[in-house]
Amino acid sequence: MPAKQATKTAVSRNNTLRLILTRYADDAEGVLARLTVPQSQFDNLLQLEGATNDRVSGEANFLPGITVHELVFGVPYYHIINAAFTYARPGGTRFSSPYRGAWYAAFARKTAQAEVAYHYAQGLREIDWREKEVVSYREYLADFHADFHDLRKKDRHKDSPFADCLDPVSYHASQRLAADLLNKGSAGIVYPSVRYKGGTCIACFRPALVGNVRQGEKITFTFEDASRAPKVRVH
């Protein structure tokens, strides 16, 4: 779908929510930090960790999809911001490629929870997991003040021209659109949530636009099995 059909909207939104597994949270103590070894050995271990850590590789300008000049440094939770762009999933996600990630967030907590719960349950189904599963996430809040391409319907009486980009299963059309917009300098995309009716999500393409990142609540999902909606606890 041509990028020219996606119009821009001035977005000024505080307190968007992104959920990150607590084991990846910025305040989680690293494994290496607990080791008592000579400094020379510790430095070697850090280099080894960096060789297998996409975020570290990106900050060293070793990744093909994003340059170090686009990443951020010296701001709170910059590692969390950079990780969103350097840890690209195999096959990509709705608006990102296998080589470059994006900062996905929701405008409301219920939307963020629904998006995360869907994808986690999908992962459980893929491995035929049939036992109880309890998993915890940390909210990361961020503010956005920029022009984003907007895929939300302007006329509720007409079909969305971006319906194929909001397909619940296929990411082919959405990734093509995102790649086109990214190459044209887009800040990112605002779009209706596919997993929570009436919800709104944002996919930011530029690390520098992810503003004022801070931690929110801890969210725990309890899946009795992968076929049922989880119980959610905010604490």
What are the roles of these predicted feature ranges?
Residues M1-T67, L71-S96, A121-H235:
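Active-site and NAD+-binding cores of ADP-ribose-processing enzymes
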